[in-house]
């Protein structure tokens, strides 16, 4: 019986020591491994908006070493060994749009390192209009290496995205609530 008590005490001591030696988990991008991740990829000091804009416009072929998932309220970054979470502005919502002719992919939260649209380097005209008729975007653009174009629009808005390209056009509706899609891959040009 005494041997069992000694064994139990030793096990408890090991658990206590292991717990004391572990590093705390953090989502603060300036602390620990999160800061290291940002530093290693040249993103230190950038806002989440700046990181998204830089990674989405990257000319690297997909998939990239650094991945990012754009959520309505945060950006989740990972390189396979470390992670960082950056908060997004409370009043803005990122819409990544991949117009297509023949093929697309299912996507809800835009993946900065793996999403690949069909139309790369193509001139398009993008219009984003609210249900009230306000034009949020009305411009010529060129799709990036990943086949997307991206826009920051007001959070809580809803409306229609229209893309024109080479005499073809497509439209889809959008909403920018807490669980809405940041990745628009259903806009087929016909």
PLM regions and their residue ranges:
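A short, solvent-exposed beta-strand micro-motif common in secreted/extracellular proteins
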Residues: 157-165
